[in-house]
């Protein structure tokens, strides 16, 4: 099952990629009642807490309560139909977090979170309570006991399942009423695909045995580096390691358990130019264990580079809106493809009255230059020795992760599918993903862009200068790093995207040195932007981040080479009017942070 991030994220038509947007980084630095139609209450167990070894207590309770609910919920008539599908998805995660700011530890904790998402479907796969705008009526979420007490877990599941049935029944009755008065839908696909049950080895629950003391020292030292840069007035260094096991059982017979292990170090810093523009830099390092994160020397070098970059950005000129040639670095290109292309290839975007359906009717048609191919492969845990955040073994509907070739030689082949069918693709391909508390939808995992027209990056730079000269432009742009972006995909908004760069240079055609600039966002429409790609570099780069959409925030990766585009449009960034701090900071000490 996909790694599930246990935190709330508001559903929105904006799709955000990245460790965080600039606004989110700055923020870090600075049920209606239902009638319950109850299943029988579970019988009391004679065994107490810890009577069953993990995961037997949890998995046993899931199996038992699922079977009881399927046999006893509903009366089988039109007013109280029996469920045709029921599933329990449990996220069981232990995490250790250490944070430092201004050279001192501000947080050092270990936490254990166990949540269940219960999905109840009434009607039939052809049409059920999730139809149309009622998709979330199938879902009920709640915390589960952390102890392996089968009685406590069973009672929690019993209560939540009853709530879930009431919610599903309310949605089902609304769907039936609406179908009598609405016009025929353009896409008459079913609401739930038919899939083969999946089983995997049942794994032990998560365990985490880590000494936080060495990491308290490491994050303290890294945070203290920013004291050398008086204009950097906000910083945060956070280390987190998570051990997670996700369980999925369904009335179809699926029974899977998927482990997840991730260690992440995030370094963030904030400054402000004299004109009030906020400036943010962030670096994220990820591995499958703390031992595989970069050593302290490498991290210190990166931290110093961030401080120097912010100092330079404060003095850089604000660039004007631009429409002309540009190079996006590999990381920048990866975010670009994630936002501009990836979201529009998610299955649920191909049906419904609200979606713009940019590529819905273009299967088998060319949508990219013929030298580009795009796949999404969540089965890859790493690439060239670097961890990929978008890796998972089973998705959040219990389907095995699969490589999906989305575009071959520029031609669109398929979409990223959950178990919500669309007219052109009726089956899941293992991309039904969700954050805890959200309904799964088709989402990206590891989006990988490859090119058959790759040149060394020095040659790509020469091609940029030549293209700028051809267009009579005094310079082209080079986007070195990008923080985040979003895409608008609904019909009631422009079919547009915005990508937020952090480091941008003007590359002059007359031989002048490259000039660092600030205050620019990349904007545009997807088809125009994608068809302006002229060539790519010969080295792939990786972007690891978190992406938010209607099914919540999920970990993603995008892999791409640098690319040259003939036309890219930029606009001025929003600029604040707050002054930098008037009072100078206290003098830095000579040590490595507070003890």
Short names for language-model regions:
Residues 404-405, 506:
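His/acidic/aromatic-lined binding-pocket segments of jelly-roll/cupin-type domains
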Residues 281-283, 417, 518-519:
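Short clusters of small/polar residues that mark proteolytic maturation junctions
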Residues 413-467:
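C-terminal, non-catalytic macromolecule-binding modules
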Residues 16-33:
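Bacterial N-terminal signal peptides
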Residues 29, 37-394, 399-402, 408-411, ...:
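Active-site bordering "gate/hinge" segments
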Residues 1-13:
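N-terminal secretory signal peptides that target proteins for export/translocation
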Residues 390, 450-528, 544-550:
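Hydrophobic alpha-helical bundle architecture
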